[in-house]
């Protein structure tokens, strides 16, 4: 099987990380999580090389100049980017590469490898629910919270650009939807070596 990209977007606080953790718990051997590089400072509990590659603005700019990134974007005054080389190596090894990136990054990545991307937008049932989750998380100032909500409203305008939409209201139901999307795309003819399969089939005559 040829690898493909499972690209996840959605507002901060929509529950993407929780759903992806469940996905990796079940499909660990088949998945490769693309670890983004970022210029923001680590949050409590985050480790370099596990959650993100934390780099300086100067290092990030060098990556842009050398075409190191498959996609990159500026989010909340910081930069985030995904390594093109690491992504391609994982795809060549038949892995399902998981991206958790914003709408800006999705549009850039799609231009470079549209035929390999399956895109899913995950959000809450409404803006009030998202606000409750962000307040409960208690990691943002009031100004940061309002900016996240505005960014979420802007991203919601891009829903039609994505292949699938999951309203993450009930965790179990949302996970089953994400799981079904992954499984279905594993068996697409588009991603398989049909010539080899046909040869093996004919040899069995």
Swiss-Prot record:
Disulfide bonds: none annotated. It comes from the Bacteria. It catalyses: GMP + ATP = GDP + ADP. The keyword Flavoprotein does not apply. Its EC number is 2.7.4.8. One of its GO terms (molecular function) is ATP binding. It is found in: Cytoplasm. Gene3D superfamilies: Guanylate Kinase phosphate binding domain, P-loop containing nucleotide triphosphate hydrolases. It is an enzyme of class 2 (transferase). Pfam families: Guanylate_kin. Keywords: ATP-binding, Cytoplasm, Kinase, Nucleotide-binding, Transferase. SMART domains: GuKc. ATP binds at residues 10-17. Belongs to the guanylate kinase family. Essential for recycling GMP and indirectly, cGMP. This is Guanylate kinase. It comes from Campylobacter jejuni (strain RM1221).
